[in-house]
C-alpha cells in the first residue's frame, strides 16, 4: 500500500479544491489526512483517484473513514459516499490557522 502513496499525492496535487493531503504511517497502519473546500471537491477527488483507490482496496482495508464538515456539506456526501461507509461528524465553528502566529 505504501508504494501507492506517491501516486495518490501526484493525482491529488492539482485538484483545485484540495486544501491539504498527506499520508502518515505507524507500522502497517496508514492514515490519510485530507481536507477539501467543499463537498464538490471531495467528490471530484474520489473520481480522480478512483482507479488508485480500487487498487489500494485490493491489498488494504479501510478501518475508519471520517468526514468532518458542515451539516449542509455532509448531506451532499451521504449518498455518493455510502459504499465507503464513512462516519460523518458535523463541524462546528472553531479556529484554523495557515501558520503559527
Where are these regions (language model features)?
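Short, flexible active-site-adjacent loop segments at beta-strand->alpha-helix junctions, enriched
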Residues: 27, 71-73, 95
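Repeat-unit-sized solenoid/scaffold elements
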Residues: 21, 63-65, 97-101
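An amphipathic, aromatic/His-enriched active-site/gating alpha helix that lines ligand/cofactor pockets
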Residues: 13-19, 35-88
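Vicinal oxygen chelate
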Residues: 83-101
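A contiguous binding-surface segment within folded domains or other stable secondary-structure elements
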Residues: 1-31
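Short linear sequence elements within intrinsically disordered, low-complexity coil regions
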Residues: 6, 26, 41, 93-94
Amino acid at each position: 500500500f505504501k508504494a501507492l502513496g506517491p501516486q495518490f499525492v501526484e493525482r491529488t496535487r492539482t485538484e483545485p479544491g484540495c486544501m491539504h493531503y498527506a499520508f502518515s504511517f505507524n507500522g502497517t497502519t496508514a492514515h490519510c489526512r485530507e481536507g477539501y473546500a467543499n463537498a464538490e471537491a471531495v467528490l471530484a477527488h474520489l473520481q480522480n483517484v478512483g482507479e488508485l483507490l480500487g487498487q489500494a482496496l485490493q491489498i488494504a482495508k479501510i478501518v475508519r473513514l471520517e468526514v468532518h464538515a458542515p451539516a449542509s456539506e455532509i448531506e451532499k456526501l451521504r449518498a455518493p459516499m455510502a459504499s465507503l461507509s464513512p462516519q460523518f461528524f458535523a463541524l462546528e465553528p472553531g479556529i484554523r490557522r495557515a501558520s503559527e502566529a
